[in-house]
Amino acid sequence: MLNRKFGYVFLLALLASSAAVGAEYKGPLDVPAKVNTKFAQSNRLTAVAKAGNALVAVGPRGHILVSENSGQSWEQVPVPVSSDLVAVRFVNATHGWAVGHDGVVLHTADAGKSWVKQLDGKQAAAVAEKSFKKAVAEGSEQAKKSQDLVTRFVEEGADKPFLDVLFLNEKEGFVVGAFNNAFRTQDGGKTWEPLFWQIDNPQSYHLYALATHAGELYAAGERGLLLHWDRQRQYFSAITSPYQGSFFGLLDTGKELIAYGLRGNVYATADGAKTWRKIDTPAPDSVVGGALLGAHYALVTVGGRILLNKSDGSGFDVIPASSPMQYASVAAASDHSLVAAGARGVRVETIRDQAIQEK
């Protein structure tokens, strides 16, 4: 009898404890990032960008670090969420956006020193549902075709990550991500509109990257997907792709638009994506980041290689790295140095004058 009574009391205590834990649980959208600069700068980071004279790097757990001395030292800054961050971009020296898991969009107006949340997956789902119903009521056939996608997006909640962000100016910007997840703002991020039914992506491939070239906006993604934003139609139209593997990034060099991705595949176009030429790379590593470096540009790979383009456009040379790692992103620290983010935080790599002049 005593054993039964003890078991009953224990069960009640366990249930009460579980209920308390459930009531107290807070997800990454509700918990600010923990600030520990030493830990954050030496562990995995996923993206880095230039903000005027500063550099800003982002990574897991909502980590954001800022450097004001070309990457020589870093300071972690407070962030209102602890969601994993994937990409960061600046439209000018002060205004920037970071995006990542849980549908998070963060904005800074002071070169990365402070951040506010402008959108998350829960809000995105509500906006998508409302916009979808309105579009269907107005007779949009494209919206009707997206019903299954929108329904899944709403039902599955805040789990869809944004993988890239690009603002054309301080007001108009785009975010893209997994499973055709895409939104646009025209008021600096105060409000957002879904683009699900305004993208020629019937298989809902992941959207990995955004870039502008010659005044036009492009997107790239899974299985060779390339898209061009038709401003008149307000629609991302598919472009004939030179490659059926995934593209992880796009880079505007001024003269050309570079698309890079899986297994070292790099392509360039100089005629508005009508034709593409393949650029040979020295290794089959997936290319995951790119940045302009003076008159040249550099790419980084998951295999820890830094590739510097040759002046004649014929290919790349591998630049020795002082501390190679599995790279995820790269930005120019100066005309002669790069800052790379990856598996072991951030690294500054100096490119010798001779190496640049010889290319």
Residue ranges and their predicted role:
Residues 16-20:
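N-terminal signal peptide c-region/cleavage motif recognized by signal peptidases
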Residues 21-359:
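Residue-level hotspots at or immediately adjacent to binding/recognition sites across diverse folds
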Residues 1-9:
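Bacterial N-terminal signal peptides that target proteins for export
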